[in-house]
Each structure stands twice: as C-alpha cells, then as structure tokens.
Design a protein with these regions (language model features):
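N-terminal export leaders
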Residues: 1-3
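Short, Lys/Arg-enriched N-terminal segments with co-localized hydrophobic residues
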Residues: 5-19
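Eukaryotic scaffold repeat domains enriched in small/polar residues
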Residues: 17-170
Length: 170
C-alpha cells in the first residue's frame, strides 16, 4: 500500500517497508506508480483520504478529513484549489462526481449528503445536520456512507450504511 508522507506524496512500500513493484496489472491493463505526482502547497497535506474522483475535465478531487476537505489537482498533479472548509465533520466518507461535474459528499459524522459545484459552491444538503435517524429505523440518515446520481433521470441514491443498512432514493 502507499503511505502518506508529510508533504502528501506517497512512497512505495508494503506493510513491512519493502519496496513494491514498479508495474502493476497485466496485458492491456498495466499501471506504474507515479512518485511525487501531487504537488501540494506548503502546509497542505492529504489527511485520511476516504475518497477520490475525477471530473469530465480530468481534474482530480481528493476528499480528506484534514484542514482542507476537498483538494483539487489537475491531471498532472498540479494544485488547483481547495474548498469545503467549515462544511464537514472529521468523518467525511464518500465522494461522487455526477455527469454535470457536481460533487456529492457523504458525511457520516453529521448524517448528511452535501452537493457542491465543481468550483466549491454548496448547492444542496440532504439530511438534518447532527440529527441522526433512530438506528435501524429505515429513516434517513444514520451515518450515510456514499451517494450517486442516476444520469438518465437525476435520482439520488444514498447508501445509509452504518446505522441503517439501507439505500434511500430521492
């Protein structure tokens, strides 16, 4: 597995500190580790990254549980922006990018799904912040974990995984 460093880069080492293979996969699906790909500004780090997604313009959105909840990089790893500060708990869980490049972010700490534009404008929130449904009640939400949008009709699907074991559809 990759391990974070203080600058937010990754080092190739397995759980015992041994160097990992340079190429992964086989046939038409071979991948190489890119050391030092992410170029973060001084003081910005990846901290507990529970999600990553790529928009239609090849921007990479990294969901973190750190000071900057969303870190945006271009395809070359150059820093673009951060956003989401003040909107999340330290339990962000899932990141999804819709067909229109909007983002859905699950936060099982405050029991919400939040929708943002790709530029960071908050567009919508589903769920009542810090007010979980009774555990196993089937009512939304008790620690939701992920969300997705059906491209054909715009329906939102939410996995309410930890405290409900349900899929809610809006």
């Amino acid at each position: 597995a990759s391990t974070p460093t203080t600058k937010g880069y990754a080092e190739k080492a397995d759980h015992e500190g041994e160097k990992m293979a340079e190429t992964y996969g086989g046939g038409d699906f071979q991948y190489q580790f890119v050391d030092g790909w992410a170029k973060l500004p001084e003081g910005t780090t990846f901290h507990e990254c529970p999600g990553v997604a790529i928009d239609s313009k090849d921007n990479v959105y990294v969901l973190t549980r750190g000071e900057h909840p969303i870190i945006v990089l271009d395809r070359e790893g150059n820093f673009v922006r951060t956003f989401g500060e003040g909107h999340f708990s330290n339990r962000t869980h899932g990141l999804y990018i819709a067909h229109d490049d909007s983002l859905l972010i699950a936060d099982d700490g405050i029991h919400t799904i939040q929708k943002f534009s790709s530029e960071g404008e908050k567009l919508m929130e589903i769920g009542e912040k810090n007010n979980p449904a009774p555990k196993w009640s089937g009512q939304p939400f008790n620690r939701p974990t992920s969300a997705a949008i059906m491209p054909s009709n715009g329906d939102v699907y939410v996995s309410d995984g930890y405290g409900n074991s349900r899929i809610h559809v809006y």
